Swiss-Prot record:
Protein name: Putative competence-damage inducible protein
InterPro entries, sorted: CinA, CinA-like_C, CinA_C, CinA_KH, Competence-induced_CinA, MoaB/Mog-like_dom_sf, MoaB/Mog_dom
Family: Belongs to the CinA family.
Pfam families documented for this protein: CinA (PF02464), CinA_KH (PF18146), MoCF_biosynth (PF00994)
SUPFAM superfamilies: CinA-like (SSF142433), Molybdenum cofactor biosynthesis proteins (SSF53218)
Signal peptide residue numbers: none
């Protein structure tokens, strides 16, 4: 089976709404072992939608549409799908009863145009929608071609697909695709690809690197008769990749770096405080996203001015005069100072020039120093980021968290 995902709606075509449905459907179809070779977006235009059906069926046997099932005149999906397969629309009385009950239960007035949502070809397989008013449907045409019509809102589409479409599609597949994602930080996509380049030509499982924000993911995908068989194919490949990338791999699946660091801090009972200048509280804010971090996170200080660095953190006036606020020496004293004053085992500091102004030849925009004081031992790292102000700050925060992760993993 080959499928195309087709979003129908001018609002998506113009970028007014982000098409998150396509990502969800692509992942779910991959899990079923169904190949998706094309995705398309079509506006609310009859001629163009019919043309899109024609083009899609040149390459696939299954079209999955989202959107265009509502009560308004520009909701055209099911009418055009029926026309494409030469099916006649008719009022489905059972759907009308369900719709009237929905409006009564929610104490809403049902306008006449809502009945439009109850018209489907008599041949259609109806997909119930307990989360909204527009049912979905499956229309099966000749030559093993089918159009699966799903509503546009994700909160309606996703459960409909999971509860009704997945069991239907499972009848047509004799294999499954299983993927495992390894999340990587500390090396760029090109460097990582160089380390695993010989593995990228493998066919089953396949290995593919993707840059995502400022970390990188490696997706290992295997096809098997069942999930267990596919996982057995993935296992030796994963071991080889972990051997090559080592502690640059920080997690699996959808886990974030902040979750990994938060868990390490809580599990190891390592109290922490932050003193930030150029990042303006981003490190602290990211850490406290982790549930339960209040057990170990004591304090976050934004010490932007030299005065605040001296008064709040105990940075020496001579240090600022001799080396400046953006220096290894200042970052060191900031990390030690916040750990001491907050009474925490870990103190983190950041100081740098985020831009766009303020840089010099000696200290350019993007120069950042970060300090990490753990149980009285202080280390400093120097970074040079070539990016705009927000990216300099974000990259600083991410690199500091990754550095902290690596240090925490060394502690028993």
């Amino acid at each position: 089976m080959k499928a195309e995902i087709m979003a129908i709606g001018t609002e998506i075509l113009l970028g007014d709404i982000v098409n998150t449905n396509a990502q969800f459907l692509a992942k779910e179809l991959a899990n079923l072992g169904i190949g998706v070779y094309h995705q398309s977006v079509v506006g609310d235009n009859s001629e163009r939608i019919l043309e899109a059906f024609d083009n899609a069926f040149k390459n696939c046997d299954t079209i999955i549409t989202t959107g265009g099932l509502g009560p308004t005149k520009d909701d055209l999906s099911k009418e055009l799908a029926a026309k494409y397969f030469n099916m006649e629309m008719c009022l489905r009385e059972e759907l009308l009863c369900d719709l009237e009950d929905y409006f009564k239960k929610n104490n809403l007035e049902m306008t006449e145009n809502n009945k439009k949502q109850c018209y489907f070809p008599k041949e259609a397989i109806i997909l119930p929608n307990p989360n909204g008013t527009a049912p979905g449907a499956i229309l099966e045409g000749e030559n093993n071609k089918r159009i699966i019509l799903l509503p546009g809102p994700p909160r309606e589409m996703e459960p409909m697909f999971t509860n009704h479409v997945v069991p239907y599609l499972s009848k047509f597949t004799d294999s499954v695709l299983v993927s495992k994602i390894l999340r990587v930080f500390g090396i760029g996509e090109s460097k990582m690809e160089d380390l695993v380049c010989d593995l990228l030509d493998n066919e089953n499982p396949t290995v593919a690197p993707y840059a995502k924000n400022i970390d990188v993911i490696l997706r290992i995908t295997a096809k098997g008769k069942n999930k267990e068989e596919a996982e057995k194919l993935i296992s030796p490949m994963e071991k080889e990749i972990r051997k090559r990338l080592g502690d640059n791999i920080y997690g699996e699946g959808e886990v974030t770096l902040e979750e990994v660091v938060g868990k390490l801090l809580v599990d190891k009972k390592m109290t922490v405080s932050t003193a930030e200048s150029c990042t303006g509280g981003m490190v602290a804010s990211t850490l406290i996203n982790y549930p339960g971090i209040s057990e170990v996170f004591m304090e976050g200080a934004v010490t932007y001015s030299n005065e605040a660095k001296m008064k709040r953190l105990g940075v020496k006036k001579e240090t600022l005069e001799d080396f400046g606020a953006v220096s290894e020496e200042c970052a060191r004293e900031m990390a030690k100072g916040i750990a001491k004053n907050a009474g925490t085992r870990i103190g983190i500091s950041t100081t740098g020039i985020a831009g766009p102004g303020g840089g010099t030849e000696e200290k350019p925009v993007g120069l950042v120093y970060a300090g990490l004081c753990i149980d009285g031992i202080t280390k400093v790292k120097k970074f040079n980021f070539k990016a705009d102000r927000q990216k300099v700050r974000t990259r600083t925060m991410m690199n500091v968290l990754d550095w902290l992760r690596r240090e925490l993993e060394k502690i028993d």
